[in-house]
UniProtKB/Swiss-Prot annotation:
Subunit note: Homodimer.
GO biological-process terms attached to the record: protein folding
Record-given protein name: Protein GrpE
Organism listed in the record: Nitrosomonas europaea (strain ATCC 19718 / CIP 103999 / KCTC 2705 / NBRC 14298)
InterPro entries named among the record's database cross-references: GrpE, GrpE_coiled_coil, GrpE_head
One CC-aspect GO term: cytosol
This protein's UniProt keywords: Chaperone, Cytoplasm, Stress response
Bias-annotated ranges (Basic and acidic residues): 1-14
KW Cytoplasm (keyword) present: yes
Compartment annotation: Cytoplasm
Annotated family: Belongs to the GrpE family.
C-alpha cells in the first residue's frame, strides 16, 4: 500500500486515453465557438451590405436629381440668354416710336411751310438725340482731332496746312455705344505737303 502522501491528486493524474478525450472536447469547443461566431458575424456583414446598398441607391438617386436640376438650369439659362438677345432693343425700340410719331405728324401736315418743316425736323432730331443719350449712344465728331484708327475711318488723305494725320473733314459722324464703336466716323485726313 502506498502512503497517501505518495499519491498524486486525482486531478493531476494521467489516466490512459484521457489525452484523446480532452483534445476532442477542446477542439469541438473551439470549432463550435468558431461556427457560432461565424453565424453571428455573417448576418452582421449581410446587414452592413444591405445598408450600404441602400445608401448607395439614395446617393445615386440624389446624384440623378442634381444632374437633372443642373440640366434644367442650363436649358433655362440658354432660353433666357436667347430671349435677352432677341428682345435686347425692346426698350430702345419703344423710345424710337416717339421719333417715328413726330415724323409721321410732320408728313401729315398739309400746306406746311419750309420753315415749319425745318422746325419739325429739328424737334425730331432733338427727340432722337435724347433717346441716344438715354441709351448711352454718343456721337463721334472728330473735326480737327488727331486721326484715331479705332474710332475713325479715313476715306482719303489730302495735303493740308494742318499737322499730318489731323481730321480735316467729317463726311459722316460715327457713334459709340458706351465705350464700343458701333460705327466709325468717316473722315478726310491731312497729310504733309509734297508727300
Amino acid at each position: 500500500m502506498q502512503e497517501p502522501h505518495d499519491q498524486e491528486p486525482i486531478e493531476k493524474q494521467k489516466l490512459p486515453g484521457m489525452d484523446d478525450v480532452l483534445e476532442t472536447e477542446h477542439s469541438g469547443t473551439v470549432a463550435g465557438n468558431t461556427e457560432r461566431a461565424g453565424e453571428d458575424a455573417a448576418p452582421s456583414l449581410e446587414q452592413q451590405l444591405k445598408e450600404a446598398e441602400i445608401r448607395a441607391a439614395e446617393h445615386h438617386d440624389a446624384w440623378l436629381r442634381a444632374k437633372a436640376e443642373t440640366e434644367n438650369i442650363r436649358k433655362r439659362a440658354q432660353t433666357d440668354i436667347a430671349s435677352a438677345h432677341k428682345y435686347a432693343i425692346d426698350n430702345f425700340s419703344v423710345q424710337l416710336l416717339a421719333v417715328m410719331d413726330s415724323l409721321d405728324a410732320a408728313l401729315a401736315t398739309e400746306n406746311s411751310t419750309l420753315e415749319n418743316l425745318r422746325d419739325g425736323v429739328e424737334l425730331t432730331r432733338k427727340q432722337l438725340a435724347a433717346v441716344f443719350e438715354k441709351f448711352n449712344i454718343h456721337t463721334i465728331d472728330p473735326q480737327g482731332e488727331k486721326f484715331d484708327p479705332h474710332q475713325h475711318e479715313a476715306m482719303c488723305a489730302v495735303e493740308s496746312d494742318f499737322a499730318p494725320n489731323t481730321v480735316i473733314q467729317v463726311m459722316q459722324k460715327g457713334y459709340m455705344l458706351h465705350d464700343r464703336v458701333i460705327r466709325p466716323a468717316m473722315v478726310t485726313v491731312s497729310k504733309a505737303k509734297g508727300t
